[in-house]
Amino acid sequence: MKSEGQVRIPSGCAIAAVISKEGNKMSGEMITNAMKPMHDRSNGLGGGFAGYGIYPDYKDLYALHMFFDERATRKNCEAFLKERFEIVKSEIIPTRKIPSVTDEPIIWRYFVSPLKSVLAALQLDEKEFMVRTVTKINTEMKGAYVFSSGKNMGAFKAVGFPEDVGRFYRLDEYEGYCWTAHGRYPTNTPGWWGGAHPFALLDLSLIHIS
């Protein structure tokens, strides 16, 4: 048996996931509550969730979840999006005030469909076009960040403990057939809203503990 100091376990995060193989919908309150017993495996520098099947009314559209530092940035980004997409719906993502979740950016979502004329001109399929668009915004548009971009799914994340982040985003009002959750415990990096897990691109979302 190894003694104290001979074992190093670098992972310190909290994770949870639930999926219905039958495709039955589950409230986001379930996954939020699942994170509560793991409170001490996070340190409040990042919590997040991803839900699948949560946008049945817009299931054929890409749901862009975005952070903006200021209104002018959002307007500039929206003008950019209108050049590339049909924007079917644009709205602020509903939240509730939570004392432990502070300094929130502007949190917005767009339900969009790539313009066929743009796809034809660029000779790209939808997925490659989406990846390039998300990458361009996140690397070139200061103050704008796409943190979720799939169909009929969405990531929700913030600086805070995951159970508080779930309440902040009102996940109890969503229903999905699959949920993942993560609580960060960074020891050498700062917490920022875009850096919380899950990391999402198209329909994929990633959480990890190391």
Predicted stretch roles:
Residues 1-61, 120-155:
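Extreme N-terminus nucleophile/cap motif
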Residues 6-9, 148, 169-174, 198-201:
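Solvent-exposed alpha-helices and their adjacent loops that cap or buttress functional pockets
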Residues 13, 47-48, 177-179, 204-205:
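Structural motif
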Residues 20-23, 56, 69-73, 185-187, ...:
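Short, glycine-/Ser/Thr-/acidic-enriched flexible segments
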Residues 54-177, 181:
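Extended, highly charged
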Residues 178-191:
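Charged, flexible boundary elements
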Residues 188-203:
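A short acidic-Thr-Gly-centered motif at the start of a beta-strand
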Residues 207-209:
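Conserved small/polar residues in nucleotide/adenosyl-binding loops
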